[in-house]
Amino acid sequence: MTMSRISHIELDDSNLPPPTPEIEQERKVAIYDLLEENSFALPARDDRAVPEGPYRVNLSIRDKRLVFDIQTEDEEKAAEFHLSLGPFRQVVKDYFQICESYFNAVKTLPPSQIETIDMARRGIHNEGSRVLQERLDGKAEIDTDTARRLFTLICVLHFGG
């Protein structure tokens, strides 16, 4: 297993309302999948040495910005970066709307219609992960699957359930 990965992730959701059961389930699955397999590296910046991973990541929203607080396993500060939430707003909103449709569809619609909604949901999810990768460019290197799982967690934080 590579050292350039996330070994622990925490969401600072202390100022958020409790999540719905569906959102809590999405969160648990995303965290489990993320910790099982991910790729997360901090590129060298300027002339500073970058502490090697694995990393502990704390995700939070402060002053309308998404904050990645990254530490080594020994809890030594490795990096911190703040991303504007603006570029995420529409895709997060679209993702939650399609998820709501999906959760409702699962209860009442035939599999063929559920599959159509699920394909749209995956497409929006892919768009969100692409936006995240763009926003992290030069700050952190992540693969597509890691971006997808982190995007799910950003959605949980962004809308607070």
Swiss-Prot record:
It holds the Pfam family UPF0262. Residues 1-21 are annotated as: Disordered. Disulfide bonds: none annotated. Keywords: Plasmid. InterPro entries: UCP032146. Belongs to the UPF0262 family. This is UPF0262 protein SPOA0072.
